[in-house]
Amino acid sequence: MNFIIATRRSKLAQVQTEIIIDLLNKKHDIECEKLLIETVGDKILEVSLDKIGGKGLFVKDIEVAMLEQRADAAVHSMKDVPYEMPKGFEIIAIPEREDVRDAFISLDNIKFKDLREGAKIGTSSRRRAAQLKLLRPDLDIVPIRGNVQTRIEKIKKENLDGIILAVAGLKRVNLDHLITDYFDTKEMVPAIGQGALGIEVMEEHPKKELFKDLDHYNSKICVLAERAFMRELDGDCHSTIGAYASIKDNIMHIIGIFERKNKIVKKEITGTKDQYEKLGIALAEHILKD
């Protein structure tokens, strides 16, 4: 059996797809090949995502490949997947999640707490920028886009004091040795779905059940809880929004942030994990009441 899996052209996207292919090969005797697609989000780098259509731009062109039957499935970073799935598509599996934290990479290995006043920090994320300002109001936030390696190179090219990147991506491309500091998930609440990969298929695909074996239940319901939170707040890349759900002894804890009335609101909620979607919605409702 031969499967074609669509993904973006970046090194990180290809590595993430190889992770899924390896997991698939351990479960089934399947030959897989990658279909590399340059999405609109990859082509337009000089403009912030919220001005050109949001993170869904990384997904739409790949879904077209599945619609045209050029691919059987797609691998995405779940943080790039809009909460409203197009008709006929579904996320069939979410494997075990990687480290969800954000990392600080500095020019000369200077710790975040030791940064000079007015230090220039690169990030294109509204979520990260807002939380950085809460931690250090003096910081000068500089928007940067591009793949992981490009952003790292911009530290020197753009005379930055440092940048913020997801730990998961750095680990997957073996660049985590460059990390200067790790942010705790309470001081820098992650993006919805950060660190998780999702396998997207068309609902009518005859072989889609083969991917279900790759599903990691706790990882999946944590991401679904976060996405329920985002859906209730109608959040997207235009929003300053983040959430992180974790499970211990069948108890789910979710921390979420959302910018409302020009103020960052942060709330937490705890409950049994079987109520994961209700917890995400309830957390959003708490924030809207603030």
UniProtKB/Swiss-Prot annotation:
Its cofactor is dipyrromethane. It catalyses: 4 porphobilinogen + H2O = hydroxymethylbilane + 4 NH4(+). It is an enzyme of class 2 (transferase). Keywords: Porphyrin biosynthesis, Transferase. One of its GO terms (molecular function) is hydroxymethylbilane synthase activity. Gene3D superfamilies: Periplasmic binding protein-like II, Porphobilinogen deaminase, C-terminal domain. Binds 1 dipyrromethane group covalently. Pathway: Porphyrin-containing compound metabolism; protoporphyrin-IX biosynthesis; coproporphyrinogen-III from 5-aminolevulinate: step 2/4. One of its GO terms (biological process) is protoporphyrinogen IX biosynthetic process. The modification S-(dipyrrolylmethanemethyl)cysteine is found at residue 237. Its EC number is 2.5.1.61. One of its GO terms (cellular component) is cytoplasm. Monomer. PANTHER family: PORPHOBILINOGEN DEAMINASE. Belongs to the HMBS family. HAMAP family: Porphobil_deam (MF_00260). The porphobilinogen subunits are added to the dipyrromethane group. Tetrapolymerization of the monopyrrole PBG into the hydroxymethylbilane pre-uroporphyrinogen in several discrete steps. This is Porphobilinogen deaminase. It comes from Clostridium botulinum (strain Loch Maree / Type A3). The gene is hemC.
